[in-house]
Each structure stands twice: as C-alpha cells, then as structure tokens.
Amino acid sequence: MKGTSSSNNSVVFLSSPVDSFNFRSSFIEDTPCDLYVVVAPNLIKELETYLNKGYKIDCFIPYEVKEKVVNNVTGIIKGKNPFLPPLVLTAHFDHMGKGLSGEIYRGALDNASGASFLLELSSFLASLPQPSRDIIIVSLNAEEFGLLGSKNFAKENKDLLKNATVINFDMIGSDKDIPLTFMAGEDTCFHSDLLDRLCEICNEKNITNIIENKDSSDHASFIKEGFDAITINDGDVTRIHTPEDKIEYISPTAIDRSFSVVWSEIFDSAYSSSGLFLLDSKVLILLILSALICLILKLRS
C-alpha cells in the first residue's frame, strides 16, 4: 500500500505477519521510495479504511540526512612474494545504532561478531611467520547504508587488488546447529574457485554447510568488480537489527567452526610453503600422547 511523505515522495506500507516486532532495516540510498514502513496486520487495514475515506497520511523519517566522510580501517601483513595476488579479509563494523525510544541495537551478531573475529584472526596471523602473499585486512564501514565502504574500497583499489581472493565475515557465531552459510553473489553464472575450496574443506571436516546466492553483504561489492569473494556467516536472522541482538546469543563453538574452515583456506593460500604444519586435532592429540609416553619411559629409565 502506498502513501505520501511530507516531502511529497512515495511511502510504501508493508504488512507484517506478526503484531509485535522491533526489526529495523538498513538505510539504502538508491531505493525507489523514500520510506518503507512495516506495520501490524490490523493497522494496515485501519490505514486502508482512512485512505478510502479520502484521508491523507503524512509520514516522516525522524532522522536528519547529512553528508559525511567516514573511513574504512585497513592493515596489511606483507608477504614474501609481492607478485602473488593478495588475500583480502573483511568485516563491517557499523551497526544500527539507537532506536527512537533510546533502545540500543547492540549488533552482537550483526556484526560485532564478524568485526571481532577479524581482529582476533589478524592478531593470530601477525604472530606467524611471514606468509607467501600479502594479506590485506579491512574493517569496512557503512555496510548498513548499502555496502558503501566495500563499494568504495573495491572500486578504488581494483588495480592494487588484481586477482585477489576476498573472504568476508558477517554474522559469525550464532548457533553450531545452524549450517555454516557461504554467501555467493546473485549472479549464479559467476564461478567461484574459493567457494569450491571452502565446500571441500567442510566436507573433509564433516561440517554441514549451505550456499546462498545473495548480494546482501560486502562480498557483493568485490564480485561486481571482478573478484572472487565469499561471505561466511551462520545464516541466523532471528534477532539481527533488533535490540535482542545481544552477546548472550553468541556461540563460541560456532565461532570455532568458522575459524577451522577459514584457517584451512588461509593456510593453503598463504602459509603452506612457509614451513608451518597444519595439524588435525586428532593428530595433535596423538603427538602429545606419544611425547608424554616417551617422557614417562625416559624418566623410568
């Protein structure tokens, strides 16, 4: 159902399947309408009644629109061979902020989880020997405004990132019982070697996973510039963009699952020739037990 805004632009009213909700959408600058309002089913009927009687519904967005310059935050771990295409690791750090009543949309899953995951992963990689290729770490801004940070970064650095592989983290660590989601682009004709490798890693580790062809995270910006890019997430949208997106719903086990998959890919891509050994947990346990047995035998002798 359409109405009018105070600036004489169009407003769309959408009927929700439930009567109570706190979901807030992202702010997208290039949508055909000024405002989309989700209302309860009984309210949509009431609005229709008033419109049919000739009433006018005035709407406004209680936010001031300003042009701002915001920044992505970028770091790099230099590789041994500058001629190899880089590996790019990304996550957006913006969130929905506050509601009209002052309630905080904390964004624990979307996307403090991905931003924190990227920070810890970066710290871990920085502690390792030098990788074979550059690893570029980017904390992206303004994802909730239409992937603006990633659009700018991918476009402005297209030549620098030539043939790069991009792994984006968005909503990591929801529930270990939810399949791990690999989000590829909407264009199903685009073949992703990265996606093939990630699925193969999951098969080797018996990790249930699904593939979604959506452009709803920052991987889409890189794909549109010709890069092989995938978003890894846990596919749980039950609390995101609501005040209930809190840290108590984050699962460390699910985060470990994501790390297990990502580290295997990063190791093969950037560390397999550096002298590091990638050990399966069972192999590591056997090695530790063997070392303990040898130590006990030596002490007894």
Report the location of each language-model feature.
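Structural recognition of the beta-strand scaffold that forms the well-ordered cores
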Residues: 10-14, 74, 87-90, 136-139, ...
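Active-site-adjacent substrate-binding region
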Residues: 172-286
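Second-shell loop/turn segments in exported
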Residues: 1, 31-38, 61-63, 101-111, ...
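Extracellular/luminal Protease-associated
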Residues: 1-36, 205-208
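Solvent-exposed loop/turn segments at secondary-structure junctions
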Residues: 17-21, 66, 81-82, 93-97, ...
